[in-house]
């Protein structure tokens, strides 16, 4: 921050926070939090306040834990209890027994030249004491869990440091870049937008039109804010490419890099992209997971796109996910599972030793490894392709979901006898579908709508199935377990669930 004191650090709807102002805010908040404040909850809103909170917590030696204020109250309470949170920045997610620390203010240069908010104060001019160590947690994020309770992943500072250095190089960031902050601040993708940008002297741009649901507004915003780097969920990019192709448009001239990730890229959309793009925009396909700190593999698709002009992709082809970044070790097991090792691997799942032992291990050299659950293949040139999951997990809107978590919640409803949840594709988008056998005496006709309301009161929106179908029975395996895939094949073939209650997923926001 000291290298570029008067350059724009954060731009929000045209208003600018300089690196000097951002530094004052961060230092002031760090002093208010005190030394090593532990896990600190933050209401994850799409504003500069959340960016300041993230950096201030890290500067204080604490661990950032984002909580969406829109989550059901019980979900928020369970999350804070699971991580032992005793401090929150701002009152948006405060619970009984949680200390609330208010954000400092600062002067912000607005579009009309006036100044807004109050001064950070004298505390902001003092350097915060050193409170960091490589194994100290940097942030905690939740992934889907089969018990119905989300699993808190603990990411250490060494993982952030190694990953951010690699990403700055991968993206080719300079102080002249303007990077859109698109991802939800609840999900780890936001860190690959925020941290490489602000450690590289570039400008981070937040704007409500990024999530307006209108592609024309989105594209106008990109041009107005002179965005050079876009990091988008693959599902959102699929829809954007369709819009550009249908309207005969191209991305604004200011865009130089587009990063996609979160789920498999559709070869048909890449063919559309190849027809639209002249090679001006660099397109990176990326792979990673919360447990391995953001992006671990990436590939510049210029080469594959050029090859596809001679031999177009077929429907069954798989788009490569690339090679490991410099800080990442990789192994492929005999059954084809990808294992990630090195400094980017998380500490594990907080308070869940069995789940941690199942996924994480350490070799004789002291290298920490994570079993991804993803099956991969390696091409002769060393590039990996994703071949699917080895377990039942599925991605919805770019967010990894364990269907068993949704099943656990649905099974808690008094009208449900049995349930199977699986992932599928509806109208070209990844989605969850649920098949429910009602208890005797339950009102089957209204159960689907009742269950949708029941879930919305308990889980985030991405865990609510797009389709809930009431069925007389589920398919079982030879051992008597519910066969999710078999139940889906049976009831989708019968046309079940095509009527009321079907709902397509929203565009992916990570």
What are these regions (language model features)?
Residues 6-34, 77, 155-161:
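Conserved AMP-binding/adenylate-forming core of the ANL superfamily
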Residues 44-49, 68, 173, 183-190, ...:
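Conserved AMP-binding
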Residues 1-17, 88-130, 138-141, 160, 282-285, 300-510:
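AMP-dependent adenylate-forming
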Residues 124-142, 149, 173-179, 185, ...:
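Conserved pre-ATP/AMP-binding loop-to-beta segment of ANL
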